[in-house]
Amino acid sequence: MGAPSSLLFSTAHWRTVPFLLAFWVLLSTGTAEDPTMTPEFLRHISEKIPEEYQNPHCFTRDLNDFICFWEGERRKNASFSYSEDDQIKWCQLRTEVASNNTWWYICEFPVTDVVLFAGITISAYPCHKCQTAREIYINELVLLNPPLNVTVKEKQDPRGLLISWKPPHFQKNHDINNEIKYQVNYSTPGADMQTVEVEAGNTEIFLTDIVPAAYTVTVRCKADGVSYNGYWSDWTAPITIATIIDLRLLLLLSIAIFVALIAGVGVYIFMRHGMYLKHKVWPQVPTPENNFQGLFTTHKGNFKLWLGQADAYLLWISRHVFQEDPSSTLEVLSELPPAALPQSFNPNPLKDSYVVLDENRMPCSLEWLEAQRHKTVIVGAESMDSRLQTVNKDVVLEDTSKGQIAVKANNRVHSLEGDGSQGEAFREDEYVEAPRMEHERHRVSRENSVSSDGKQSIPSSFEYTELQTCEGLLSPKPRPVPPRMPLKYAYLDMSSSGEHSPPPSPNFYQNSPITNFLAPIYSQS
């Protein structure tokens, strides 16, 4: 029983030896065949690698593997060798059909021979475009996988697209994330592709200046730093996002449309019911303009002028009185000759007769004087003659005949002819003054005084007139029209010595409708 059992044990032991040898060969020569190393994948990698990188092409995807390949003629004696620290090693090649006459020769380095930051010398045969031997560094031939978890979000404040991703995964814990840079492609339908490069270490980008459209975004990466370098990876799967219109712009547009609509409705309502709304919102304030026509336009608010009770003569507009100044009263003083007459010698009243002594000195308002004379011919003459009789008893005027006036003074009779060339004969110390009404103006009289040469000066008086202003208008204070003055006194031109004194200056502020009347001429010794 013992012999057969030992025989079976020895037979089973020898059957497991080939499997152990195969496993040892795999560990010593390399890893198992990579199923991704298809002819299509190798063609894609060869097209991706730039031309400056010569054959054979080598790369590492996760810093844990290293693969070299090239395209050459079909040979059974093809070989690939690499050396590190002057120790040459031969790689077991794997072939894939490239075309009708060429094969892909593939060498996969064992994991134990993948050494970073150390130079490796490689040589391949047959390879017409390959150097006999060249030195490479695995950490400079990195071919990364595309970035992971690419996301695109639309932001409104500020408006734009936020694109983010994660770096590719590595089997070994290598600090390479800070040495990977990225490229982002984005485009809209009908527009050219735009590429933005992101600096190493950043894993997001914010795109501004976007428009409402559908955006397609892709991302790729590349090792580009001090320690690692390599090739651009494949682009990620495209991500499409449709952006909407800017909410702020939409809000502003909505507000503008709403305001325009409200304005249109308001204009329509105002055009249709404007007067009604005006009376409702702003009631009409009562104004006297409707009841006082012309008071505030023609008469400038002067109520007296509007009633017709003010003077209709010259109105003086002061340039120095403003509308905001309060109303004031102005008094004007003027010096006038006295109204006293010498005593009359004739107790009898004078008759109302006159003669024109000088035809060249006619009254300015003869028609008005004639009309007034007919109205008050009796009353005026009697009152004036009676005053002359009571005031002066030394001078008497008598009518001698038609066209003549006799003046009797100091028992001497002087005849005034109708011819103006003969003149009048009076004594130098005698004079006749046309009487003036006492109530015509206010007077401030003064007594007779003696002049510097010893002669007695003529008594004089001061007249003042009150003037009132109303909105810049200055006019004399209104007075009633004085009674008629006998016309004959306006023509008395008497002189005994031939010397005539100049007439007094005209008073422009005298409220009299006969301001153009010739003032009496006085004769004094």
Curated annotation (Swiss-Prot):
Q: Which residue stretches are annotated as topological domain Cytoplasmic?
A: 271-525
Regions of this protein lying in the Extracellular compartment:
33-249
Record-level GO BP terms = cytokine-mediated signaling pathway; erythrocyte differentiation
Q: Which residue ranges does the record assign to the Fibronectin type-III domain?
A: 146-246
Transmembrane residue ranges: 250-270
GO CC annotation, single: external side of plasma membrane
Q: Where is this region: Disordered?
A: 434-459, 492-513
Short motif Box 1 motif, span: 281-289
This protein's name: Erythropoietin receptor
Q: Which organism is it from?
A: Xenopus laevis
